[in-house]
Each structure stands twice: as structure tokens, then as C-alpha cells.
Amino acid sequence: LMGRLSASHSNHDKLYQNLYASAYDAANNTATLDGYVDTTKRKTSIFSYDLTGEFETAGITHSITVGAEYLETDNDNDRYHANFLPDYNSDPDTEVFTIARPLNISGNVGVNNDGNTTTNYYTGANRVNADMTFADIKVLSFYLNDEIALTDSLDLVLGARFDNMDIDVTGTTTGADEDDTISPRVGMILDLTEQASVYASFSETFAPKAGDQYAKVSANDEKIDPNTFENLEFGIKYDLPIGLTFTAAYFEVEANKPEYDVATMTSTMVKSDITGFELELIGSLTDQWFVSAGYTNLDAKADGGNPLREAPEDMFSIWNNYSVSDRLAVNLGIIYQGESVIKTGSSAILPDYTRVDAGASYALTENTTVQLNVENLTDELYFPHSHSTHQASVGAPINAMLSITSKF
């Protein structure tokens, strides 16, 4: 038997703020701006221990893993409303601006549609605290996995995981949830030849919330309920003679996840069915050239037949890494994502986009490497995500990061 103990602790401090168009008046060519600042302080501790070993029964080899995991998160979330002063529309949370490109506001100071200067206060004595929420999340898990070598070419995988999740939310709004779930897993792997194998698997997955956002929780809200998934998958893996490995997989996923409705400011569980397939090529074409390419096709529908939010039909990526010398390597990648609806049942879409990334690394010594990564090389304007139909996230423009990594 071999035991493994793991412990980790993280401190997370995040702030994001947003000004967005909450209303539009076509007749007067104006837009009403609303906004918020959200701060999150989170501490997470994770402890896990597992045992692995092998034994035989009646000539059949079992590879066993058994373990336990405990997660605890303390989450402190504050939200502050926009506060436009002087207040010209009897609602300091919003202000009306004439539509122009760019809009006449910068650094939270702007001129409204009547020509009056107004300032939005996110900090200082004039800021307005809209919500204070404290969340305590505890998850205790036990798991068992057995890989059984039935023959030299056939393996059976059996497993199960028990999760107990307890979430307690207090503050401006309150809520609580406790769930006990057993998630089974079964799979089979058949080696057809030394180069080819096929597999099939079924699993249920229970995904507790990780403590990111718990603001505006009501007693009957499903926002803090866990995500649940049923996954059925089968596929093939083949080692090509040119140094690449090809994999193809078909999958069906039945998911239950809470989806937030901006209009009602509550979350409801949305059941969805996702079917699709994945194709992947990965490996080394030469001693110097490594390539990874993948394509995914999705057919994602909610229970009523509407397209599922942010589930594009087509996704493609390719990544190349070329070793110029023992010390210098360069890389180039392309990511494509097809269009998707912003909200389940909505006709508003996030348009498709293509992003090009590049980079280079140089080994200064055996243990120290300097690396330059450039994201969005062509400075593509794209929208990877949207909170709602009027709050789309803009992808970062061309940017670069230089890092030095040392191993001790």
C-alpha cells in the first residue's frame, strides 16, 4: 500500500466593478447606466488522504484507491451600488446619458443627457453598501475506485464517491443548504491492438459551489444548490505511426444547474441535455515539433428545447510548440469558438470569434526558464462570456506576460 497526504490553503481577494446599460430610450437616443462594485475575500483549506494498492483474487488483479477529502471555505462578499451625485433623476443608483461613441463618462465622472456633470462614487464616504454576505461552506467526501484487469486486454473500472455538503449563508440575505450524495462510476477499456483501444463509461457527478458568489440569496433561491451531472461516454484511441495519438469520443450529459435571472434576481434550476463529440490529435510530428489539436461539436438544449446559454455548437483549437534549440522554444496557437445564445431561451447571441496566441521560452539554466506569452496577437474584439443580455464581457485586447520560473 502507498499513502498520500495533501493539504493546501489559499487566500483569495478579488474586486470587480461594472457600469452597464440598464435601459435604452430610442426616441431620445439615451441610455441609462447602472453599476456596482463587488468585493470577495475567501479563504479555502483542503485536506485529503488516499491509499493505493494492488491485490489479486482468483487470478484477477485489482488496483484500488480509497480516500477521504475535507474542504472548508469562508467567503466574505460585499456589493456596492453605483451612486451618481449630484442626483438628477431621483435615483442615485442610475444616470441617463446621451448615446455617443465613446459615452461621455470616464473615470466615473461624466456629463449626463441634460449637460450636467455627475460623479459615480464607488469608494469613500459616498459609496452605498447594497449587500453584505458571509458564506461558510464545508464538504466532506469519501471515495473508492477499483480498476480490475479481467484479461490482458480488458479492464473494468468501478467506483463511487460520497459527498456531504453544508452551506450556511448569513448577512443582508440568508440561506442554507445541506446535501448528501453518492456518485457512482463504471467504465470499461478494451485494447484491440497495441495501438488501438476503445472505452465506455458512465458516471454521476456532484459539484458543490466553491464559494465564489453568494450575494442576494433568498430563502427559496436555488442559487446555492449543487450542480449535478450524469455522463455517458464512449470513444476510441489510436496511436498513429507518425507520432500522433488520435482520440474520438461521443458523449451525452444530463445536467441540473442553477441559472440566474436578472429580471427576477433569483436563480432556478435548469435541466439540460447535451450531446456531442470530440476529436483530438496530440503528439510529436518530429523531435522538435509538438502539436495538439482538438474539435468539439455540441448540441445543448434546455428541458424545453431551447438552446442552452453559452454552449457554442463548434469549438476548435490548435497549439504548436517548436524547439529551435535545447534552450529556445516558440509556440503558436489558435482558438475558435462559434456563436452561442447569451441566455437560455433568448435570441441574443455572443458572436463567434477566433483568437491567436503566441509565445517563446528560453532556458537560462537547467532550473530557470524565462517565458514570454502574447495573448490575442491580432487584437481581436471578442466577447467570451455574458452575465445577461446587457452585460457582455469583452475579451482582453492584445497583451503580453513575461515570467521567470525556477525549480529548486
Language-model features and meaning:
Residues 1, 52, 56-59, 151-153, ...:
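Outer-membrane beta-barrel channels and translocator barrels
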Residues 1-12, 35-170:
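Face-selective signature of the C-terminal outer-membrane beta-barrel domain
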Residues 1-5, 62-68, 156-158, 198, ...:
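Transmembrane beta-strands of outer-membrane beta-barrel proteins
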Residues 1-8, 12-18, 191, 197-199, ...:
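Membrane-embedded beta-barrel scaffold of Gram-negative outer-membrane proteins
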Residues 49-53, 142-148, 186-190, 234-238, ...:
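Residues on the lipid-exposed face of transmembrane beta-strands in outer-membrane beta-barrel proteins
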Residues 74-76, 166, 176, 189-233, ...:
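Surface-exposed extracellular loop regions of Gram-negative outer-membrane beta-barrel proteins
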Residues 152-153, 249-254, 267-344, 378-381, ...:
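Gram-negative outer-membrane beta-barrel transporters
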Residues 339-343, 361-408:
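C-terminal beta-signal and adjacent terminal beta-strands/loops
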